[in-house]
Amino acid sequence: MAKRPDIFLDTSALFAGVWSDSGGARQILKLAEAGVVGVCVSPQVLSEMENNLRQKAPDLLGKLAVLLDRIGLRLAETAPPTRYEAALALIGHPGDARVLADSWEFGVDYFVTLDRQHFLEKRELHVGLPFRLGTPGDFLLWYRQNYIEKNT
């Protein structure tokens, strides 16, 4: 059987997984809790997530901590300047380039986001990266096709 895929969740995807008890992002967290996928985020994502929850839903901070513990979250290290510059050349936005570079350096199999403007609608990202990029639903379809159907 193939190794479990490593998934990077950006802030939008992680927020959706914590905010809603259903939906694709929450399904990814459930897969991680079951140990069939690995989830990582960057320090920037954790910081943004905490700030967003403090502003929009402070009562969910405890839920975030419990979920992150249950899924065995791994923290991607800050990528070196050369990787950051390569990501910046692809995406053009410094904050998003940092997140992209950190996931790239970690060696993820899939980058999950709900950010259409900066990630999903940039075609050059889909061909310029060594990993897939898509929505939670896109990832779940890819996972089913590449891990479930191939092993049944």
Predicted regions, residues:
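Active-site neighborhoods of divalent-metal-dependent phosphate/nucleic-acid chemistry enzymes
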Residues: R74-R116, L120, E124
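PIN/NYN-family metal-dependent endoribonuclease catalytic core
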Residues: F8-L9, W19-Q55
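Conserved beta-strand segments of alpha/beta enzyme cores
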Residues: G38, G72-R74, P130-R132
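Acidic, PIN/NYN-like endoribonuclease modules and their adjacent C-terminal/linker elements
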Residues: L46, D109-Y110, R116-T152
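Intrinsically disordered, low-complexity and often Lys/Arg-enriched segments
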Residues: M1-P5, K150-T152
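Domain-scale selection of a single, long terminal region
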Residues: P43, S47-E85, V99
